[in-house]
């Protein structure tokens, strides 16, 4: 009789779900205090005016206004939330 030996079990075939990281509000969009602007691992973006940073490096708005991205020292990208009248200038 023909027999097939037991096949070895594979050690692959698993993957974790995506973490939904990235920019949630882009430059020029309006933000309300408490809105999440960026979810990130580490400080790819740094907090500027009107913005706070969480323990997981999430950048969030602390004031109402428009989101702006700008370069700073050491090549860092800062995110600020400026009041609508100030951002228009």
Swiss-Prot record:
Q: Which GO terms describe its biological process?
A: translation
User: Does this UniProt record's set of keywords contain DNA-binding?
Assistant: no
Q: Mind listing the UniProt keywords for this protein, alphabetically?
A: Ribonucleoprotein, Ribosomal protein
A GO molecular-function term, please? structural constituent of ribosome
- One cellular component GO annotation, for this chain's record? cytosolic large ribosomal subunit
Q: Which Pfam families match?
A: Ribosomal_L27 (PF01016)
Note the PROSITE patterns from the entry. Answer: RIBOSOMAL_L27 (PS00831)
Per its UniProt record, what InterPro entries does this chain match?
A: Ribosomal_bL27, Ribosomal_bL27_CS
Family stated for the protein in its record: Belongs to the bacterial ribosomal protein bL27 family.
- Name of the featured protein: Large ribosomal subunit protein bL27
Originating species: Ruegeria sp. (strain TM1040) (Silicibacter sp.)
Name the gene behind this protein: rpmA
């Amino acid at each position: 009789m023909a027999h097939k030996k037991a096949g070895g079990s594979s050690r692959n075939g698993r993957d974790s779900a995506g973490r939904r990281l990235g920019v949630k509000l882009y430059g020029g969009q309006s933000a309300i205090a408490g809105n999440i602007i960026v979810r990130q691992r580490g400080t790819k973006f740094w907090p500027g005016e009107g913005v706070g940073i969480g323990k997981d490096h999430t950048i969030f708005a602390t004031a109402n206004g428009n989101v702006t991205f700008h370069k700073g020292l050491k090549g860092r990208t800062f995110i600020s939330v400026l009041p609508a009248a100030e951002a228009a200038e």
